[in-house]
Amino acid sequence: VGNPYARGEDSSVQSNMTVTLKDFYADWCGPCKTQDPIIEELEADWEGVEFEKVDVDEHQDVANEYQVRSIPTIVVENDDGVVERFVGVTQRDELEDALQEAGA
């Protein structure tokens, strides 16, 4: 008699969810350059997550849609919408927590 909602059962449902990390940046942004290696490490380790870099100078429409006012801004979302938003340089552990919360 097990719990049907036990973590092992639940993870298969979560793995079907699309999880995306959007990294809003600009080439001239110093803190964005600090953020880059952290994002690159995550991308190498989190195969099931879609990573998108969004240059705010080239894609102002997308930046406006996500209400990006400062960079770097990182948005973690899944099929249900935005799960977490980070403004400024964000450490790997915080981003990993958000990816897990999103269902990755």
What residue spans do the PLM features occupy?
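Typically the conserved alpha-helix immediately C-terminal to a functionally engaged Cys/Sec
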Residues: 33-46
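Thiol-based oxidoreductase modules, predominantly thioredoxin-like and allied folds used
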Residues: 24, 43-60
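Non-catalytic, surface beta->alpha helical segment in thiol-disulfide oxidoreductase systems
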Residues: 76-104
